[in-house]
Amino acid sequence: MTERSIFLEALDIPDPARRARYLDAICGDDAAQRERVDKLLAAHEAAGGILDRPAADEVPTGMYRPITETPGTLIGPYKLLQQIGEGGFGVVYMAEQQAPVRRMVALKIIKPGMDTRQVIARFEAERQALAVMDHPNIAKVLDAGATESGRPYFVMELVKGVPITEFCDQNHMPAAERLKLFVTVCHAIQHAHQKGVIHRDIKPTNVLVTLHDGVPVPKVIDFGVAKATVLRLTEKTLFTAYGQMVGTPAYMSPEQAEMSGLDIDTRSDIYSLGVLLYELLTGTTPIDSKRLRTAGYAEIQRLIREAEAPRPSTRLSSLGGEATVLAGNRGTDPRRLAQLLAGDLDWIA
């Protein structure tokens, strides 16, 4: 296998331990090849990758300045402890609130140099989207403010969890248990829709699962590209710019990929939920991620709009030896898993 094909195969294995075992087996004693593949993977992680971040999450040319906050920095009553996330326009920190109560929180702040009118509007829209919702499976907004230099921030509930797909695989959860978690996620998204908010970027890394008294609890996070339907999220109505792709391609609905300027509605989130369910059941997304990674921008759009996804029950037969691992993560074997997925789940996912 070429280094490129090894790299693409490794990207499809989210669990670090399983990815390392795959690389050990495929690279063998070729230490130089392993080092080059590891560097490719590290560069991909550092860049985020088009499939791993929202397509609209780009940095305006010439506006970026280095992040000035470091562990120990005080922003209002919040002491920053460590960076836990970063997007195109914002950075998320784990922080400790010191007054009037002491607790751990997540603090999201606009990057230096990114405080343009459009970015601030998007940032404020995310804060307002979270503020209007009150659901146990959606991260809560606790506070908001601005730094001395005027950069806005908001404070959220700290969700110490892992992406829903990783949680299910690590715990070898059978399909029935995965469906229970998925239904809970659907209830959370339904609540957002009832409040007039479309998420627009539903994917595993935006659905984190944590344990409460030994019970897995999913939390929907990151409404950074959310859109209002029946209420205004900011004082100025936000429109998606014509020709701007909003969402993450592997989970994106055809109407999002179209970029025609036409409004999308709650059905777009429902489509993305279907992709998430497909991945929970089969371990893969409906459109082969390798095809998306090697495709150009126009081809990505065409694949999302036109590609015919195989039914979940037949997808396993195309995965070769990987099907045994995926089925094992679901507490069964490939034949039984295919039988389980045939029927209603084939049509729902």
Task: Annotate each PLM feature.
Residues 11, 64-326, 341:
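Conserved ATP-binding/catalytic core of the eukaryotic-like protein kinase fold
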Residues 19-21, 35-36, 49-53, 288-290, ...:
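Short, hydrophobic secondary-structure boundary micro-motifs
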Residues 2-3, 18-19, 103-106, 345:
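N-terminal alpha-helical segment
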Residues 340-349:
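Conserved C-terminal C-lobe helix
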Residues 326-335:
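Short hinge/gating elements
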Residues 32-58:
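Structured, non-catalytic alpha/beta "coupling" segments that mediate domain-domain communication
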Residues 1-26:
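Eukaryotic low-complexity, mixed-charge intrinsically disordered interaction/regulatory segments enriched
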